[in-house]
A protein has these predicted regions:
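Basic, polyanion-binding surface patches
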Residues: 1-161
Length: 161
């Protein structure tokens, strides 16, 4: 059943995002996710999920602030790098710090600076709900990074065919 469920979930195409935090040493760390969702406009809330066994769980669960960075199609290299277990460090030339201390990745289609609103244990994951303090978006006509059936994919906007 688990394999069938994984394949069924994979048929839902999603965008790709990086969750980012700063450690006590001010080093930025990030993790690739595709479980991002908007929750509410009033109050401004968003959500994302993290597997309990993630090597980033301790770091992300301990932080009261985080940012969500929606990746553009040309940022696949960053998605790949931060999806793998390892140190998850984001280099200083890859981001700026926002007004609410969020790690804002250069080139992202959108960035959200958040405070943890709620953490919910949900099976083998934790559901994080963030209160959005600031949202930034790219006005350039760039394509998002899309994940579908276990691979990156391109978005074709209806009418562009």
């Amino acid at each position: 059943m688990q394999q069938e469920l994984r394949k069924a979930f994979g048929n839902f195409g999603t965008g790709v995002a990086i969750i980012a935090v700063r450690g006590g040493d001010q080093q930025a760390y990030g993790l690739t996710i595709n479980s991002f969702a908007s929750v509410s406009l009033q109050p401004a809330l968003l959500s994302w999920c993290l597997a309990n066994e993630s090597d980033m769980m301790a770091r992300l669960a301990a932080s009261e602030k985080f940012s969500v960075n929606i990746l553009a199609a040309d940022q696949q290299y960053l998605s790949n790098r931060l999806a793998k277990p390892g140190d998850h460090k984001i280099t200083a030339d890859e981001y700026t710090i926002g007004a609410h201390d969020g790690v804002l990745l250069h080139g992202a289609l959108a960035n959200f600076e958040c405070r943890v609103h709620e953490k919910i244990n949900a099976g083998d994951h934790v559901l994080f709900i963030g209160a959005v303090d600031a949202a930034h978006y790219c006005s350039e006509q760039r394509q998002p990074l899309i994940y579908f059936r276990g691979a990156y994919s391109n978005l074709q906007v209806a009418g562009d065919a």
